[in-house]
Amino acid sequence: MKKIWKHLFNQNMLYILLMLVQIAFLVLSVLFLNRNYAWVYGALLLLNGLLIIYITNSRKNPTYKNAWLVVIAVLPIFGGLSYLFLKTRRDTRIFFHNYKQQMEQTKPLLTQEPDAARHLFNDSQQVYNLSTYLQHTGFPVYEQTNVTYFPLGEEQFAEMKNRLREAKRFIFIEYFIIAPGKMWNEFLEILIERARAGVEVRLMYDGFGTKFFSTGDFLKIAKQHHIQCQCFNPFRPLLSSAQNNRDHRKILVIDGNIAFNGGTNLADEYINEKVRFGHWKDTAIMLEGAAVWSYTMMFLQLWNMNNPNKKEAYDQYRPTYLPKQTNGGFIQPYGDSPVQDDVKGVMVYLDLISNAKRYVYIETPYLIPDHDLLTALKLAAEKGVDVRIITPHIPDKWYVYQLAWNAYQELLESGVKIFEYTPGFIHAKSFVVDDELAVLGTINLDYRSLYLHFECATLIYHCNVIQTMLADFLKTQRKSQPITLEDCKNRKWYQKCNSYVLGLLAPLL
């Protein structure tokens, strides 16, 4: 009985109940007005008409436009008011204003070093054009950076611990999910030891992905050991579109000289200490050298987002050494955000797919591409490019898995090869293209990751590590089962119905 009460009155349930109360209040208010005043109904219809014109002419992704237009059409009384309520809240406006302000204030600190840009131009005009796009959005391209690839989360974690123990100046940590367990306990033990030694430690976690900090003793422990903590966008039971904008990034910066990034969060399933969906396949990279500066700045931009007037001494966090030997090439870390027109994640993926000559190999846990990405993948395959995608065989979300099958059939009909990782769940987010280009980071092939979340990734060109990534992809493919058109046709009728209905909600999943 105690367990039942605990589940009924835990934090998540209280949030859901408060949200439902707000929705019920809005619905009842509108219905009451509509029954008693004919002019209210007329005003709502006029409002809906104006909103339809506004949404149709906005710069938003067409899929999101269609989703809202359907809501307004199906719910003429409630739909328009819902849009206004969600999009005009003051907290949402302040949220995006603060981010834009931070980006403008720090732009002079992320200027392009001329030699790297010139060398890239001489090497490849096509890649230079993509790089220039990222430069214009505030993310330079670098040389003098070594890249190490980790095919599994446990291998990355072992190296992270080694590097953390050597920290001398500062440690910046930014993760979507941090959960109690072996991984976090070992991580925290090292942070406390380094903080005692005088190392500056800052930790930022997402307010939705990581909730246990608010209920446990961690914040008290952190304060005792001089570990600075910040919750990004605390989750509140309010109807606000800003609650969708989560910090999905995974960043660890050590002394400004080393940065880790990839798909792994700080929880036991990511290092296969806890089995949830079979074997957990994740990937990550470690950067050493000049390119670490971009990850340092990405962290500080979000850290100072709620305190835009803070005078941060940014230059003290610059790299203090460059590796004498690297595995060559050009490295360009970049961040993505839900701010309007900031769609670097989509644009980079589209460019890689559209300009591929021989092959595009993709790993993603969620395959819910928007229309542009779906079209680009199909066109590439129809042009003769070898397009392969590996997704999980054991999904973590049943509804996302059902949606993936919507894309499967359309892609297979165009010649795209699809594989499911048979041992379990693949959480990696990576592209490998033509032996020359690669992207690895936190950006999934779904709407939330591409348009709603704060994300980050690294573009890699002409670097020896790409061959290591390619070999790991092919090794993973050998452990995966191919999906065929026959598999799509043989699905149960109710599975197909689920996929079609869920397709209406794809932008929200």
What function would you assign to each model-found segment?
Residues 301, 376-379, 406:
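Short, solvent-exposed amphipathic alpha-helical segments in soluble enzyme
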Residues 429:
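Catalytic-core elements of nucleic-acid end-processing and repair enzymes
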Residues 417:
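Surface segments flanking catalytic/ligand-binding clefts of nucleic-acid enzymes
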Residues 362-364, 421, 440-441:
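Thr-Gly-centered strand-to-loop micro-motif
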Residues 1-347, 351, 355, 395, ...:
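N-terminal localization/anchoring segments of enzymes in phospholipid and broader phosphate metabolism
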Residues 366-387, 392, 397-399:
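Helical hairpin unit composed of two closely spaced alpha helices linked by a short loop
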